[in-house]
Amino acid sequence: MDLLLTNARLVTLQSGEMGYQPSTPMSIGIKAGKIHYLGIDTALAATKQIDLKGKLVTPGLIDCHTHLVYAGNRSNEFEMRLQGVPYQEIARQGGGILSTVYATRQASEAQLLEQTLPRLDGLLASGVTSVEVKSGYGLTLVDEIKMLRVAKSLSQHRLVKVTPTLLAAHALPPEFTGRANDYIEFICQEIIPLVAEEQLATSVDVFCESIGFDLAQTERVYACAVEHGLRIKGHTEQLSNLGGTALTARYQGLSADHIEFLDPAGVEALARSSTVATLLPGAFYFLRETQLPPIELLRQFGVPMAIASDVNPGTSPFCDLTLMMNMACTLFRLTPEEALRGVTQNAAQALGYAESRGQIKTGYEADLAIWQIEHPADLSYQVGTQRLFARVVDGQFEQHKECCDE
């Protein structure tokens, strides 16, 4: 073994009720970055052995929807919204996404990296071991590529697995005002082929919304992405019901995200597919929305629900995934178990890693979060204390720098 962790109380999240209940003290043997052994043996030969002294171990948390890479600051919009100006009106006035686009275009890769790392550090401190990062604030070929390169480079600066997603269809850039179809063709003819060729992203996302792109434009991007061997994700049904979730499910998309205005037909479409419903409570909270996602209907149809931070400067400036777990429980009435599965097992499925991450299971990647807590429900219950002891990413152990337990 390369690493043996002993006296660990495991929350494996394997199928069944017992996957959520902490185990009696066990050992985890890690070899070549994967979980090789789960059992009670504490004397296995290992290059490195660490006694966890009864600490709780969960799968590493997975943030499956973020906009981490951007430049600029939009706290002024926060003040505007508190004065009653709706998000849609801010966007129509050239604010919103486009204000971040201008700042991001002006920033170099080095400047973007410098501004992104503190946000990433916040997520890592909340137990995140894998993170999805979208483009979408460049909206030109050069700037979208720049964002994806910065996203891919994050794993060179921090111990984390990064999954980049192309979101060129995030907003209509000013150069294409009044020509949304032309911009969609530009994405399909210029951006997607290059991103696929250079392997800068594994999936393509579209903001399918009344202030974004319509159903036909979304499908044009989806079809092009599939043609180039890329997976599908969608921002759907956040502010209205356009049918984007059902379209995403029809293309066997990895996930449909936001979904506050999802109708029963959309839920049934998800149930017929493998597409995950990703909840973004941070944006719901920050925008003071009132339309709740159809949680009970999703439960009834057995649709897997993921939870993500949606870290972004305009609608969810939160860099703590456990805070999102708390919000999902308090605002959306998820159980703490559903919340934990939402940032592990189901989040892994939302990124295409259902068979390799998101559970503590032999043969899976050794991605773990080690906590100084009594029960997994504590992760959703209490926010703001230093609970993370260490993370393990692809078998590499890293103790949290602010943890006082030696």
Swiss-Prot record:
Q: How is the cofactor bound?
A: Binds 1 zinc or iron ion per subunit.
What the entry lists under InterPro entries is as follows: Amidohydro-rel, HutI, Metal-dep_hydrolase_composite, Metal_Hydrolase
Query: CDD domains from the entry?
Result: Imidazolone-5PH
Give the UniProt record's GO annotations in the biological process aspect: L-histidine catabolic process to glutamate and formamide; L-histidine catabolic process to glutamate and formate
Q: Per the record, GO CC terms?
A: cytoplasm
Q: Which residues bind N-formimidoyl-L-glutamate?
A: Y137, N312, G314
- Indicate where this protein resides in the cell: Cytoplasm
Q: Needs which cofactor?
A: Zn(2+); Fe(3+)
- Binding residue positions for Zn(2+): H65, H67, H235, D310
Q: In which pathway does this enzyme or protein participate? A: Amino-acid degradation; L-histidine degradation into L-glutamate; N-formimidoyl-L-glutamate from L-histidine: step 3/3
What's its catalytic activity? 4-imidazolone-5-propanoate + H2O = N-formimidoyl-L-glutamate
Entry binding sites for Fe(3+): H65, H67, H235, D310
**Which Pfam families would you find in this protein's record?**
Amidohydro_1
Molecular function terms in GO for this entry?
imidazolonepropionase activity; iron ion binding; zinc ion binding
Residues engaged in binding 4-imidazolone-5-propanoate: R74, Y137, H170, Q238, T315
Q: What does this protein do?
A: Catalyzes the hydrolytic cleavage of the carbon-nitrogen bond in imidazolone-5-propanoate to yield N-formimidoyl-L-glutamate. It is the third step in the universal histidine degradation pathway.
Checking PANTHER family in the record gives: IMIDAZOLONEPROPIONASE (PTHR42752), IMIDAZOLONEPROPIONASE-RELATED (PTHR42752:SF1)
Tell me which family the UniProt entry assigns to this protein. Answer: Belongs to the metallo-dependent hydrolases superfamily. HutI family.
Q: Which HAMAP family match?
A: HutI (MF_00372)
Q: What is this protein called?
A: Imidazolonepropionase
Gene coding for it: hutI
